[in-house]
Amino acid sequence: MTSPEAWRGVTWGLVTAFLNWQLQNGYAVGTINGRLSTVKVYAKLATKAGAVDVGELAMIQAVKGFEHKERKHINDKRKAAGIDTRKGAKKAQAVSLTPAQAAAMLDRDTTTDTGRRDRLLLAIMLRLGLRVGEVAALQVGDFDLKHGELNFYRAKVDKTQTHKLDALTLEAARDYITQDAPAIGIIWRGSVKGHGLGKQGMSARAITKRVQFLGAKVGAVGLSAHDLRHYWATQAARNNTPLDRLQDAGGWSSLAMPGRYIEAAKIANQGVRLE
């Protein structure tokens, strides 16, 4: 519904009914909140185009989503009623990866072009924690091999960052860029079954499928690209990375998400004395 005319007749009551319909049909609370935000943005644009009344827009904007603290109560009620609680894009729970499994995934055959690409692909997610969309968008020119840095754009927070590459990631970047990467543009080349690497470009979906394939080889069945970011953040939190540094390095716009990793990394019974 990107055409303003398509929004004629959309009311706050319709928006509220849409929220309730999603609740009854098992959509995740986060997904519902995201869709509500999208509806409000488009309703505002439609109002500017004259398709939605200003008063109606005010009422639509007043429709509230669900706060994080409400989610458990909402989901408990839905479970009791036999309604699903996780219909949406994300998995209900991340697949946990051990340090040994992560190391095994990074141990690629660097005598092949596919192995060199996979090693860099995995290193960027496991060692730098980039989102899969950010990884897919990386350009050859984003890598400064001389200074060991990666300069890239984070669309989710609309900012460009520079990250220092650790020794493993820098080595992987040198191996792939000097031997296999395109001269300019998107750095990745897709796989051609039985023939190594093919044409330029890998979608976020293709990267996730590759991660899933490589994860299964080390016993991490169902692994996704987001799980690699989860692993990175978890390891950073467990090694006492300050909250503000984790927020910046992970490209989060608020302290809420990195704060969860810090909280989860705490030893719950630390300081408890029984004698």
Predicted regions and their residues:
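Conserved catalytic core of the tyrosine transesterase superfamily
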Residues: 1-275
